[in-house]
């Protein structure tokens, strides 16, 4: 099928949030169901977060945390000390990965012992290495295909995992393949039939192969030794746009769970994920290993500075232009998150007209454009990436200095995933959330979830409002109008008319 499931950013968010209570959107989301503004005529500061301990105790299933080996000045834990094979230790060292993170120290030894695993850790802590290393080590001891299947919700995540597995396994003749939407299905069927060692797939496209490609293509899946669900909370979320039907199709051709190891990794350990722990085990099977490292107490990175900026809905683009040009942010790599594809498209067009080096990533783009745009941003050919929540999870984009929430996310967990794109691996980072009068309830829910309070963005000695009026109001309004016209006329971001493209109307 041409597109992976779900096909739109709204459906992607539905799949991620599942049956959790929806929060109403801001007025910029073009919805009549926006939350009612507070009675106060203005907000000078966001209210402090409430004590969340009672709420968390009531809403989450209690899980005993795995004990993680501690490092001290005398003895530091290494990959060799947790039984990783020498060739893998050398391969990781060549990638400048020399010491295991908390999730890696806890999970790798247990997976090597043959245990199923549920691993939870915040973004940027090396979960991909935590499941890739034991799979590669076991494969090297008994090479066969298809040895491992890794299922992940988005194409970009699948590509990233594919590249990382390929890099780690470089010293060996390992053959991984990608099975995602947006690529030729016939070529993928041939690759699957050739018995690759590891398959990295999105659930929609793999399910399509299982239904249509024939037994010769999928028979290798019947002997899989490892199955990994990356971003498991999103894969298993119920509700509209759920990926569960496709996952059930994938599981239908795999060996019984007693004959394979199942690994689930996520930054957000949801009740749907934890429910798998209580499933009955076959006699003689080791208990499921459950490890949560920093999923609650450090949901956002310690080196992250979380800021907010009050913006009138009618002039948000002006404030964004000014924010990007402040001396503090002028050289930073920036990701701007929007709730809607239309908003992301408009911002990309407008910012390009304002001479920013910008690209975009969202479900409205063709697969090849998504790949090339992400590559441009990673190579710093583009300084700014305008994205929807397609880019919020798992993508390892180094050196992102600033995350801007142009729209307040509807769900607090989406906020955690967004701001987790910066301040990775202990590096400092900033996030700025644009807040309108109707967004206060959403922000308070975010503060309660992360257990902290946002600070107001300030530029020393400068009035942001003054800069907007003086430097941005006229030019940004003009360029926004031009951008809307180009989109309506079916022109691309460079202003060229797209062949065969019908006119599109974008509602402001």
Swiss-Prot record:
A cellular component term, taken from the record's GO annotations: nucleolus
Coiled-coil positions: none
Span list, region Disordered: 1-68
GO BP terms in the entry: rRNA processing
Subcellular location as annotated: Nucleus, Nucleolus
CDD domains to which the protein is assigned, alphabetical: DEADc_DDX49 (cd17955), SF2_C_DEAD (cd18787)
Reaction(s) this enzyme catalyzes, per UniProt: ATP + H2O = ADP + phosphate + H(+)
Residues involved in ATP binding: 121-128
GO molecular function list: ATP binding; ATP hydrolysis activity; RNA binding; RNA helicase activity
Residue ranges annotated for the Helicase ATP-binding domain, each copy included: 108-287
InterPro entries assigned: DEAD/DEAH_box_helicase_dom, DEAD_box_RNA_helicase, Helicase_ATP-bd, Helicase_C-like, P-loop_NTPase, RNA-helicase_DEAD-box_CS, RNA_helicase_DEAD_Q_motif
Entry's EC annotation: 3.6.4.13
Keyword vocabulary terms for this entry: ATP-binding, Helicase, Hydrolase, Nucleotide-binding, Nucleus, Ribosome biogenesis, RNA-binding, rRNA processing
Tagged with keyword Nucleotidyltransferase: no
Annotated motif DEAD box, positions: 230-233
SMART domains, sorted: DEXDc, HELICc
Residue ranges of the motif Q motif: 77-105
Domain Helicase C-terminal: 323-465
Ranges of compositional bias, category Low complexity: 57-67
Described function: ATP-binding RNA helicase involved in 40S ribosomal subunit biogenesis and is required for the normal formation of 18S rRNAs through pre-rRNA processing at A0, A1 and A2 sites. Required for vegetative growth.
Family named by the database record: Belongs to the DEAD box helicase family. DDX49/DBP8 subfamily.
Domain notes: The Q motif is unique to and characteristic of the DEAD box family of RNA helicases and controls ATP binding and hydrolysis.
Protein name, as recorded: ATP-dependent RNA helicase DBP8
């Amino acid at each position: 099928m041409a597109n992976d499931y779900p096909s739109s950013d709204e459906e992607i968010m539905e799949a991620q949030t599942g049956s959790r209570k929806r929060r109403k959107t801001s007025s910029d989301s073009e919805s009549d169901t926006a939350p009612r503004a507070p009675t106060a005529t203005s907000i000078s500061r966001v209210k402090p977060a409430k004590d969340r301990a009672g709420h968390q105790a009531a809403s989450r299933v209690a899980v005993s945390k795995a004990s993680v080996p501690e490092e001290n000045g005398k003895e530091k834990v290494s990959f060799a000390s947790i039984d990783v094979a020498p060739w893998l230790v050398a391969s990781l060292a060549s990638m400048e990965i020399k010491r295991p993170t908390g999730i890696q120290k806890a999970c790798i030894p247990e997976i090597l012992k043959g245990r199923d695993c549920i691993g939870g850790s915040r973004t940027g802590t090396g979960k991909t290495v935590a499941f890739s290393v034991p799979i590669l080590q076991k494969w090297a001891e008994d090479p066969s295909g298809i040895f491992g299947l890794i299922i992940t919700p988005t194409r970009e995540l699948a590509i990233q995992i594919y590249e990382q597995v390929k890099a780690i396994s470089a010293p060996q003749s390992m053959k991984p393949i990608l099975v995602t939407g947006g690529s030729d299905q016939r070529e993928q069927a041939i690759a699957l039939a050739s018995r690759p060692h590891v398959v990295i797939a999105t659930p929609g496209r793999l399910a399509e192969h299982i239904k249509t490609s024939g037994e010769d293509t999928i028979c290798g899946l019947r002997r899989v030794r490892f199955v990994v669900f990356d971003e498991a909370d999103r894969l298993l979320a119920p509700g509209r746009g759920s990926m569960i039907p496709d996952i059930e199709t994938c599981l239908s051709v795999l060996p019984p769970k007693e004959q394979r190891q199942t690994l689930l990794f996520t930054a957000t350990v949801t009740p749907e994920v934890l429910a798998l722990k209580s499933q009955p085990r076959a006699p003689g099977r080791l208990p499921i290993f459950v490890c949560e490292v920093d999923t609650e107490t450090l949901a956002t990175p310690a080196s992250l500075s979380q800021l907010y900026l009050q913006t009138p809905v009618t002039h948000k683009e002006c404030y964004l232009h000014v924010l990007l040009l402040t001396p503090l942010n002028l050289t930073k790599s920036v990701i701007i998150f929007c709730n809607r594809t239309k908003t992301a498209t408009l911002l990309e067009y407008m910012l390009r007209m304002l001479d920013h080096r910008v690209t975009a990533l969202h479900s409205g783009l063709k697969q090849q454009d998504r790949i090339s745009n992400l590559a441009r941003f990673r190579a710093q050919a583009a300084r700014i990436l305008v994205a929807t929540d397609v880019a919020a999870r798992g993508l390892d984009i180094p050196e992102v200095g600033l995350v801007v929430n142009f729209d307040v996310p509807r769900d607090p967990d989406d906020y955690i995933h967004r701001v987790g794109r910066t301040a990775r691996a202990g590096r400092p980072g900033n996030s700025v959330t644009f807040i309108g009068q109707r967004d206060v309830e959403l922000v308070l829910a975010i503060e309660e979830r992360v257990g902290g309070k946002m600070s107001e963005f300030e530029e020393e000695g400068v009035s942001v409002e003054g800069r907007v009026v003086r430097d941005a109001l006229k030019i940004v309004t003009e360029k926004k109008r031009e951008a809307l016209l180009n989109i309506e006329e079916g022109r691309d971001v460079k202003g060229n008319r797209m062949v065969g493209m019908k006119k599109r109307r974008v509602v402001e």
